[in-house]
Amino acid sequence: MTTYFNYPSKELQDELREIAQKIVAPGKGILAADESGPTMGKRLQDIGVENTEDNRRAYRQLLFSTDPKLAENISGVILFHETLYQKADDGTPFAEILKKKGIILGIKVDKGVVPLFGSEDEVTTQGLDDLAARCAQYKKDGCDFAKWRCVLKIGKNTPSYQSILENANVLARYASICQSQRIVPIVEPEVLPDGDHDLDRAQKVTETVLAAVYKALSDHHVYLEGTLLKPNMVTAGQSAKKNTPEEIALATVQALRRTVPAAVTGVTFLSGGQSEEEATVNLSAINNVPLIRPWALTFSYGRALQASVLRAWAGKKENIAAGQNELLKRAKANGDAAQGKYVAGSAGAGSGSLFVANHAY
C-alpha cells in the first residue's frame, strides 16, 4: 500500500477553499432548488398547478427574481440541469440573474438511485461515468459547486456493510472528479428518517456512515478544505416519539465531532422532511450546543425554504410578490438559525410535516 500521492495544486486548493468558505459565510446557507421534473410535479400538484416546463420555469423565476437582499442569507442555489439553461420572461438566463445578486451557482450531478442487488431494498447512486465531462461543461456555464446524494435506510438489518461501503466510495469518487474540474463537491450521505428507530440508533448509524465516508474521501485523496458535507440531522424515526430540539442538536453535534475532520469547511444540513419551523429551530439549537464546533453549521434546504412560498404563490401571477416575501422570511429565519439566533415561532413558518416516505429527488 503506497502512501505517496499528490494534493491538488496550490491554485486549485485556493480556488476550491474560497468557494466553500463563501458558501458557508456567517448567516448564509443554500437554497436547494434542484428538484427533478417528477419531484417538482409533486410540489406543483400540491397547489393544483400542472407540471409543465413553463410552470416549473415560472416558479423558479419567482424564486430567483426575489429582491437582491435574498443574498444576505442565501449564498448559493443548487440547480437542476433544466433550470441552469432556462431564462426569465425578458430573456435573461436564470444563471445571470443569480450571479448579479452575488449568489453562487451549484448543480445537482447525480442521476438518481438504483437498487443494490441482493440487499434489503437498499440503493446506490449512479452518474459517475460521464461526470468529468459534465462537470467541465457546468464549470464553463458558471457553476462553482455540485451536489450528489446517496441514501441509506435504517432497518433491523440496514444499512448493511455493503451499502455503507458502496455509497461512501461513490461519494468519494464523485468528490474527486468534481475537484479535478474546479468544482466544490457537496457530499450528501442522507440517512433517511423513515422508520420507528430511536435517537440513539439514528446517532450510531449516522456516525458509522460518516466514518466510512471520510475514510473513503481520504483513500481518494480528496482535498477536505474544498468540500462541504450535507448530512441529515440526527432525529428519531418518523414514526417514533419526537425528541426536543436540544436532544436532536446534541446527538447531531456529537455525531459530527466524532467523525467529521476539522479540515472540512462547513456542514450544510438537509431538512429531511422536517416542517419549516422544526428545521429552523433545530438548526438554531445545533448552533447553541456547548461543545467546540470547528466547522460552519448552516442549511441547504429545499422543502423547508419553499413550502410556504409555493402555498403563497399557488401558481398565480398576482401572488408572485407574496411568494417572494415568504422566501425572504424563511431565508432570514434560517440565516439567524445558522448563527444560533432564531427565536422559535418568530417567522410564522409552517409547522406541518414535509415528510415524504422513501424520498427520492
From Swiss-Prot:
Q: Which Pfam families match?
A: Glycolytic
Gene that produces this protein:
Ald1
Q: Which CDD domains match?
A: FBP_aldolase_I_a
What are the binding positions for substrate in this chain? Answer: 56, 147
* Region forming the signal peptide: none
pH dependency:
Optimum pH is 7.2-7.8 for isozyme alpha, and 7.2-7.5 for isozymes beta and gamma.
Q: In which pathway does it act?
A: Carbohydrate degradation; glycolysis; D-glyceraldehyde 3-phosphate and glycerone phosphate from D-glucose: step 4/4
Q: Which InterPro entries match?
A: Aldolase_I_AS, Aldolase_TIM, FBA_I
The name this protein goes by in its record: Fructose-bisphosphate aldolase
- If researchers knock out this gene, what phenotype do they report? RNAi-mediated knockdown is lethal. Glial-specific RNAi-mediated knockdown is semi-lethal. Neuronal-specific RNAi-mediated knockdown is viable with no defects.
What does the UniProt induction comment state?
Answer: Expression correlates to dietary behavior: high dietary activity in the larvae and adults causes active glycolysis and high expression levels.
